[in-house]
């Protein structure tokens, strides 16, 4: 019987079916960070339990670390306390910790892949919403809560309800100036922020076949923003080339055996899906959000929605709420909206290729007067790669502040925060109310190059026009 990758991985990791309809799943890899793990370790101590398989758990610090300070003690005592607590917990329970002193620290969803910890055909859990990033490698990866972090630490298993599988095919060729971020924003806009509830998304088609691993990670990262618990791409030669030689990837004969196994985990031809969505790549334009969830998106040349044209009362109320918070006018073009801050980074777009693309076009240009622009690499390794290529200098000369690795302004748990009702052009993944540190701060999501275009013009702009983009 033909099976999807999701069904194969689910079946291979099923421990038992539970009476409540859930499945007890073996978790192949567990990733932790400083925010959702302290309470879980505390519960282990209270119960007198050990970590069942410490070799399957990997830790890093990312959410609260300051990006403008690397020397300890940190100015923020909470950041220092959380860093110290994670160090203590990892040492006590024998868990590998990618601390800042290792040169391998960074956002957990960037560290896992670059270390070769993220691999096809396994299950991956982490106490973070954007764990679906790892699905780019053909893994079933999902975010979990603190009590589930405890369960995985104690048993290497957790309970999860069944999911349906929706295949999303994007065929054709993307137009110049359209990036992976535009693809996922278009998908979420099309299917809605709740459209994926109860689903795993399988991304496929000619566009994904051509995408690099970093582009696939960008798309899978935001699956949860469309309601999907899981998002994945079938593993192929692009996957294997990326993984080969990385620290935790198999070596020698074990590598050949792994590739054979990984090829077999891909969805079978003729397997059944619960739903199939087909999208023409030519229909995707540079896309930005205008509202207060990632599904409230429009192409750069569209107008801000008018609640008077809503199809029902709920949609009308949602548009009105978003317009009031964002201080935007219905029917006005989104292009030309003034910005105060530009943020490059996050687990969505904080990888080497993101900074390479931006540096290529901002070289010789300057951030507009009155705009604060920061560039935050997703890991220490990404930072080092950028610095070896001189990308940090290009960005700094253009007026961006080059920072140390961390989550930074994506969720603003560290000092990188908006002030008042500042509007930020952001390459991150969420534009919720207050997401970037100020209860009245405003966020517009877009691709890294669109962030750069906004930074140098001081307003939401079409990067194709600003930089003369003719090819990706």
Curated annotation (Swiss-Prot):
It comes from the Bacteria. It catalyses: (2R,3S)-3-isopropylmalate = (2S)-2-isopropylmalate. Binds 1 [4Fe-4S] cluster per subunit. The keyword Iron applies. Belongs to the aconitase/IPM isomerase family. LeuC type 1 subfamily. Heterodimer of LeuC and LeuD. This is 3-isopropylmalate dehydratase large subunit.
């Amino acid at each position: 019987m033909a099976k999807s990758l999701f069904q194969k991985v689910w079946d291979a990791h099923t421990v038992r079916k539970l009476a409540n309809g859930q499945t007890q799943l073996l978790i192949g890899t567990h990733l932790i960070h400083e925010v959702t793990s302290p309470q879980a370790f505390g519960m282990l101590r209270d119960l007198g339990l050990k970590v069942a398989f410490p070799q399957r758990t990997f830790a890093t610090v990312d959410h609260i670390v300051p990006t403008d300070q690397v020397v300890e003690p940190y100015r923020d005592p909470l950041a220092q306390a959380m860093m110290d607590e994670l160090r203590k917990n990892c040492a006590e329970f024998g868990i590998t910790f990618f601390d800042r002193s290792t040169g391998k620290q960074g956002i957990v969803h960037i560290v896992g892949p670059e270390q070769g910890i993220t691999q096809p055909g396994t299950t991956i859990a982490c106490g973070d919403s954007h764990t679906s990033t790892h699905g780019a490698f053909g893994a079933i990866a999902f975010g979990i809560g603190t009590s589930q972090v405890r369960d995985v630490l104690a048993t290497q298993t957790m309970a999860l309800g069944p999911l349906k599988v929706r295949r999303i095919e994007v065929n054709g060729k993307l137009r110049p100036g359209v990036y992976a971020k535009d693809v996922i924003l278009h998908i979420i806009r099309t299917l809605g922020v709740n459209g994926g509830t109860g689903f795993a998304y399988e991304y496929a088609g000619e566009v994904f076949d051509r995408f690099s691993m970093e582009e696939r990670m960008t798309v899978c990262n935001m699956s949860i923003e469309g309601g999907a618990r899981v998002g994945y791409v079938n593993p192929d030669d692009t996957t294997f080339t990326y993984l080969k030689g990385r620290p935790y990837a198999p070596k020698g004969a074990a590598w050949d055996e792994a590739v054979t196994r990984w090829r077999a985990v891909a969805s079978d031809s003729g397997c059944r899906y619960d739903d199939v969505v087909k999208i023409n790549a030519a229909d995707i334009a540079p896309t930005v959000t205008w509202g207060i969830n990632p599904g409230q998106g429009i192409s750069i040349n569209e107008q801000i929605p008018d609640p008077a044209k809503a199809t029902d009362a709920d949609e009308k109320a949602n548009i009105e709420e978003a317009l009031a918070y964002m201080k935007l006018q219905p029917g006005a073009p989104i292009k030309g909206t003034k910005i105060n801050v530009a943020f490059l980074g996050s687990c969505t777009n904080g990888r080497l290729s993101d900074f390479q693309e931006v540096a290529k076009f901002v070289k010789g240009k300057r951030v507009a007067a009155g705009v604060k622009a920061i560039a935050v690499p997703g890991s220490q390794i990404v930072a080092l790669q950028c610095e070896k290529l001189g990308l940090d200098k290009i960005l700094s000369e253009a007026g961006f502040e080059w920072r140390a690795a961390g989550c930074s302004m994506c969720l603003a748990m560290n000092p990188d925060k908006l002030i008042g009702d500042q509007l930020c052009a952001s390459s991150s993944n969420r534009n919720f109310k207050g997401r970037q540190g100020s209860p009245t701060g405003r966020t517009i999501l877009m691709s890294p190059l669109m962030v750069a275009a906004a930074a140098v013009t001081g307003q939401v702009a079409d990067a194709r026009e600003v930089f003369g983009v003719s090819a990706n």
